[in-house]
Amino acid sequence: MAKVREVYQSFTDSTTKTLIQDEAYRNIRPIMEKHKLSNPYAQTVEAANDLEGFGIATNPYSIELHTHAAAKTIENKLLEVLGSLLPQEPVTFMFLKPRKLNFMRRNPRIKDIFHNVAIEPRDVARYPKETIIHKLAEIKTDTAYISDTLHFLDPSYIVETFQNCPKLQTLYATLVLPVEAAFKMESTHPNIYSLKYFGDGFQYIPGNHGGGAYHHEFSHLQSVKVGKIKWRDPKDGLLGHLNYTHEQVDTHTVTVQLQESFAANHLYCIRRGNMMTPEVRTFGQPDRYVLPPQIFLPKVHNCKKPILKKTMMQLFLYVRTVKVAKNCDIFAKIRQLIKSSDLDKFSAVELVYLVSYMEFLAALQATTCFSDTLSGGLLTKTLAPVRAWIQEKKMQLCGLEDYAKLVKAVDWRPVDFSFKVETWDFRFNPLGMWKAFQPSELSDVEEMNNFFDDGDLLDCFTRMPAYAVNAEEDLAGMRGDNQGETSTAPREPEGDKKEYVNPAETFLDKLTRKHNRETKSRAAKKAKRLAEIQDSINRDQTEEESQGAPNMGEAPSNAELPGTNGAGAGTTFPTLKALPQKWEDASFTDSSMTDQMEIMPGKEAVEVATQKVVDELPWKHWLPQLNAVGFKALEIQRDRNGTMIMPITEMVFELDKEEFPEGTPEALARELKAMNRSPTTIPLDLLRARDYGSDVKNKRIGAITKTQAASWGEYLTGKIESLPERKVAACVIHGAGGSGKSHAIQKALREIGKGSDITVVLPTNELRLDWSKKVPNTEPYMFKTYEKALIGGTGSIVIFDDYSKLPPGYIEALVSFSTKIKLIILTGDSRQSVYHETSDDASIRHLGPATEVFAKYCRYYLNATHRNKKDLANMLGVYSERTGTTEISMSSEFLEGVPTLVPSDEKRKLYMGTGRNDTFTYAGCQGLTKPKVQIVLDHNTQVCSANVMYTALSRATDRIHFINTSANSSAFWEKLDSTPYLKTFLSVVREQALREYEPVEAEPIREPEPQTHMCVENEESVLEEYKEELLEKFDREIHSEAHGHSNCVQTEDTTVQLFSHQQAKDETLLWATIDARLKTSNQESNFREFLSKRDIGDVLFLNYQRAMGLPKEPIPFSQEVWEACAHEVQSKYLSKSKCNLINGTVRQSPDFDENKIMVFLKSQWVTKVEKLGLPKIKPGQTIAAFYQQTVMLFGTMARYMRWFRQAFQPKEVFINCETTPEDMSAWALSNWNFTRPSLANDYTAFDQSQDGAMLQFEVLKAKHHCIPEEIIQAYIDIKTNAQIFLGTLSIMRLTGEGPTFDANTECNIAFTHTKFDIPAGTAQVYAGDDSALDCVPEIKQSFHRLEDKLLLKSKPVITQQKKGSWPEFCGWLITPKGVMKDPIKLHVSLKLAEAKGELKKCQDSYEIDLSYAYDHKDSLHDLFDEKQCQAHTLTCRTLIKSGRGTVSLPRLRNFL
C-alpha cells in the first residue's frame, strides 16, 4: 500500500488528481453501500480501526449514533455472514427479532418460522408478541438458528433439540463469549467491549454501556470448546442403559464447528452426523501474552494476570542490563512503558508482584553453572554425562543454582487462545447428572507435575548436541542401557491416595527416565560408527607400540596439517583412522621418470626406487586423488619456516559417501569420484536463506533483483519461509587457486556437451565469460551470474564456482527457492577472500561467509597449485610442481599492459578513469590468472586481511611487480598513521594558504556608560509561568509501541524538566525525528524533480546574482585558489585531535560508500524559550555522517565560492561566518536603520524543504563559478542518490554535508530576494536559515506564481524596533547600541546550567555573553522592557553568587 500511495502522491496535476478522485469515489460508493447495512454507525477512530481488522469498513461521514456501535456492528456482520449460509427455504429462527432478517438479506417471501421464548423480563418487549411461545416447540425445518442464547442453556438442550426434532439437520448458533475471560484478562478489544469479574462469573459490557451487559458464569466458556456431542436413545428408564453394551445402545452424534469469529462474537454450525472437525479451535488474539511462573510461596504473591510478552521482555532486558536494578528504577521503567491512558487497566497489587518478580530475576546470575561439551579430552568427555547427572541430582536435593533458577523463572507460559475441542458423551451418563462444566482447581501435586514437565528447563541440561558426543561417551551409553532400564524405579500405583506427594521425588524420577531414553536412542543410532572408530583406535595403538614411531602410511591428523587452525581441527576426526583398502592398493605411474628409467639398470630397479619414494611420503594414500588433478606429488616441499607442506589438508572422514542423484551425467560423476568428491546430504540453514530473501525482497542488496516486481520478492520469501527443512546432495570442493578445482568439471562438461540439465552459477560476469570460452560446446544459458540464476531458474544440477564470492545465504536461498535442484557442486577456496556486503542495513552483512558453513562437508582441501611457480607457492604455504623462479620487482612506476591490483574499490575506479581498464581490487581479482600482475601498495594495504593478500599474490604465474605509492618516512606521517585510511585521500604537498585575515586597527576607547541600579527580582520570576503549566513526564514524552516512551524530561527538578534533553541513544526520539525530518524517495524521482524545477532554479539564481553583486559573466576557474581552499579545509580537519581523527575512521575508509550516509540523532539540550515546558516533546535534529573525502571535496567547493562571494559582496549584506560579535556590532551601527520596523525571517523545516529547485540553484551557482563539471555532477549524484538505512532520501539538506552552512546561507539569500522586493541599500544579515532586514519589504507579485512550486515556507517576524522589540538574529538582538544576547534566552540557558550543577564549567562563556549587554549599563533601560530587565538582573546575580570565573567581569560586583 505504501508504494501505491507513493505513486498516487507523485501526481501533481490538478486535473489528474480530480480524475483519480472521481474514479476512486465511483469505486468506493458501492463498497460503502454494501457495508452500510451492517455498519451504519458513527465509530470512534480506535473502534473503526479494530473493525477494519475484521474486514468491516466504516463510513467516516456517518452520524448515526449507538450506545455500543462497534459491538452492534459485529453482531450485524455475523448475521450477514449467516444469511449467505442459509438455504433459500424456510428456516426456524429462535430468540431473534424478525426485523433482523434485513441484515441476512433474506427474501421476505420465504415463510420463515420464529420461536421466541421470554426467558428474561425484557424479552417480552424485545420480541413481537406473535412470535413469543410458552415453550420451544418441535422444529419442522431442516435448518434452524439460535441467536446469542445457546451459551446460557444447559448442554443437554442441544441433545434434546436434535432428539425431539428428527427433521432438523443443521443448527446455526451465535455465541457472545470473550475467550480471554478464561484467563481473567482485560478485554483484548477494549474499543468494542469491556469485562468485569465478580466471583465465579464475569460481565460482558458492549461499548462500556451497562444497559447492554451480559452476565456469564465461567462454566459458559466450555461452549466454545465443544466439537462433538453423543447421546443414546432412552431405554428402560433412567438407568436402563447400564444393562446394555455399547453395541446394543443406539448412538446419535452431532458435529460442532466454528464458522466465523469476530472479537467475542462467534458463529457455530451444528450438524447432525459424525463428521470431521479440527482438533484445535483458535480464536483471534491481537497481542501475545505470557504468565510468569508461580515461584513464590504463598501463591497469592505471584503474578496471576497475563502480561504482554513485549512488556515482559523489555522489563527483563532492562533489569539484566542495568548495573543495579533498584526497586524504584523498576517502578519507573514500568511507568515508562505504560501509557497514561492505560494506567487504569493495571492493579497496584499486580504491579507490586511484578516488580518483586523482576527484582528476583535481577539478583540471579546468568552465567551457566553447567559444563560444556567442547572442553576437555577424551576421558573428560566420556565422564561428562556422569558429572552432569550427579550435578542434576545434587541440585534436586540441595536446591537449584542461580542460573537454573533464572532459566526456570523466565520460563513464561504463553497465553494462547487455542483450545482442544471436546466431545460431550451422554451415552452412558444421565443428562440430568451432567456435571462436567465447572472448572476445577489444580491440586498441589498436579501443579508441581506441570511445573516440572518434560519440556521444561532441564531439557537444556540433559540434552547434548549430537556432534559433541564422542566415541567413548556413546559406548558407555550402550553398555549402560540395560542397567539404566533396570534401575528406573517403577511408579507406585496411586489407588485412592490423595495425600501430598513430594514434587522433588517426581522430578528426580522424570529426569532419570529421560536420561535413560536419550542415552539409549543416541547409542542405537551411532553403534556402527562407534565400532569403526574404536577399531581404528585399537589398531593405531598396536601399530605405535610395535613401531615406536609415527605411522607415515596413515593419513596425518589435522593437528599435523599446515594451515589448519584449532577450530578446524575440532570439527574433524579426533583420532587417526585407517584409510580405505582401495586407496592403499592404488597403483602409481610417473611419466617424469622416463629419462631416469633409461639410465637405471632395469625396470625392476625403477619400480623398487619409485616404490621407496612413495612409501616415504606422508600422503601416499592420497596419490590417486592428486594424480587425478594432475599432480605427481613425489616431492616433499617446505615453506619459509621449514614446515612440510602437505598437498592434502583438512581431511574429514566421517562424511558418508552417497550415490549420485538420478540423472547425473556419467562423465561428471566419474570425474568427481576420481577426485574422491562423492556427494553427501547437507541440511541447509534456512535462517541464512531467509535473511538473503528478506534483503532481496526489501531491495537492500543486488542490482538486477532490485528491478523485479515486489510480488516476485514476496513469492521468493514466502516460498523459503514455507519450508520446514531443505536437504540436498552436495559435493564441496576446496582447493588453492590454480589447483584444478574447476578444470575437471569443465572437462566433464565438454564431454557432456549440449542437452544437459546443468547450470553453472558464477559470482561475476567476467568469470561467466571465462567459463563460456573454456566450455564452448554447451548452451550459452548454462552459465549464469548468481542474480540471473535466482530470477531465471536453474537446472537440477547446479555448479557454484568460486562460491565464496557469492553473498552469504545465497546458496541456501537458491536451493530452497528452486525445489528441482537435487545436486549442488561447490568449488572455492577457504583461504581466499570472501563476499563483502557494503549495505549497512542488509541482514546478510551479519552472516558468516559460505565457506565456513560448507567447509565441514568438504572431504579434503587440495593445497596444491598449477598456477604459481614453486618458490612463490611455497612462500604462500602451497604445494607446486612448476619449476623456475618467479620474478619480483618493485618501483614507483606502472607497467603498461599488465593487470593492476589495488587495495580499495575507490582506487580501482580512479585508475579505471585514467584508462587502466584492467584494474582489479585485491579481493575482486579472484579467478584471474595472468603471467604478470602489478600490485599497488598504499596505506590501505596494511588493513587488508590475510585472505585478501593471498588472493592478490596468487594471481601471477611468472612475475609480480609491486608499485609503492606511499611517501617516505617523516615526522608528519605520525598523525596520518592514526587511522589506516587517512593518507589515501589527503594531499601532502606544501600548503599554499590564502592571505590571512588582518584585523582592523582598534577603535579609540569610547566614554564609559553611566552606571545604574536594577531592583532585586524574585529568582523564579522568569520561569514560574512555564512551571505552572508543566505536565507530568510521561504525558509529555513521545510514546512508541516499539520502544516505549522517550526520555527527554529528566530528573525531579522542575527547572530541568522544562528543557528537553535530546540524546542520541533515545530510540523513540530517534524514530520520531526520522519520521518528522527525513523523507525517502528514489533516485529516479529525485532526478525527475531536479529536472522539472529547472526554471525555478534559474529564477533563484538570478535573484541571488543580483543580491550579491556577482558579475554577469562566469567567473574563470582559478586552480590556485582551489588548491588553497582545499588545503584550508584539510588543515582545519587535521587540526582536530588525534582521538577525533581515529573516531572518524569508518567514514575515512575507502569501503565507505560515497552515497551512503550514517544518520544520528543530535544530542542537545533544547533551550529555545518557545519550547520550554511544551505539552508534547518535539522531534529532535539529525546529524548526517558522509564519506569524509566527499565532505572535504564539497567543503572545498563551498569555500572556493565563498572566497569569490566575499570579494563581490555588497557592504550592506553581512554574513555571520567566521566573524565575531564585535564585527557584527560594528557593521550594524554603520549600516542598520533603526527608524522603521524590521523583519526577521525563519523557516519551517528549512533543511527538508530544500528540494530540486534549490539543487538547481546550487548547480547554476557552481557553473557560474566555473567549478569543474565532474565535481558538479558528483554533487548532483550525491544529492539525488543519498542513501540511508531506510532507502534513498528525497532531495534535501543534511547537517553534516561539506557545504551545509554556505549552501543554507546562499539558499536563504536567494529565496529572500525571490520573495521580497528589497530596496537598494537595505541592511541584511544572514547565517544559515536565520536572516534579518532593517525594513519590511513587499512581497513580489511574481512570487505568487512560484509559491506553490517551492517547498520552502518562511515565517516572517516583524519587530517595531523600539524598547523591548528589537530584531533577533541567531540569539542576538540588533539594537542601536550594538548587538547583545537576548537576556531572557541567556537567563533561561543559565538556569539550566545551574540546575545541572555545571555552572562552574561554563561560567566564563556566560560572563562573556552577558558583557555585551552589561557594558551599556544605564542605556539598558532604553533597550529592555520589564521582563528583559528581570532576566538580565537575575543573570548578573547568579553569576556574582557563583563566584568569578577565569574570564570574569570585575565590574559585575559593583553592579548591585
From Swiss-Prot:
What's an example GO BP annotation here?
mRNA modification
A Gene Ontology molecular function term for this protein is: RNA-directed RNA polymerase activity
Keywords of the record, alphabetical order, are: ATP-binding, Helicase, Hydrolase, Multifunctional enzyme, Nucleotide-binding, Nucleotidyltransferase, RNA-directed RNA polymerase, Transferase, Viral RNA replication
| Region called Disordered, residue ranges | 474-500, 512-571
Give all residue intervals belonging to the Alphavirus-like MT domain. Answer: 59-225
Give binding positions for ATP. Answer: 735-742
Chain ranges of the (+)RNA virus helicase C-terminal domain: 863-997
Name the Enzyme Commission number(s) assigned to this protein.
Answer: 2.7.7.48, 3.6.4.13
Q: Which SUPFAM superfamilies match?
A: DNA/RNA polymerases, P-loop containing nucleoside triphosphate hydrolases
Q: Could you confirm whether the keyword ATP-binding appears in this record?
A: yes
The (+)RNA virus helicase ATP-binding domain sits at 695-862
Report whether Nucleotide-binding shows up as a keyword of the record: yes
Quote the function comment for this protein.
RNA replication. The central part of this protein possibly functions as an ATP-binding helicase.
Name of the protein: RNA replication protein
Organism of this sequence: Potato virus X (strain HB) (PVX)
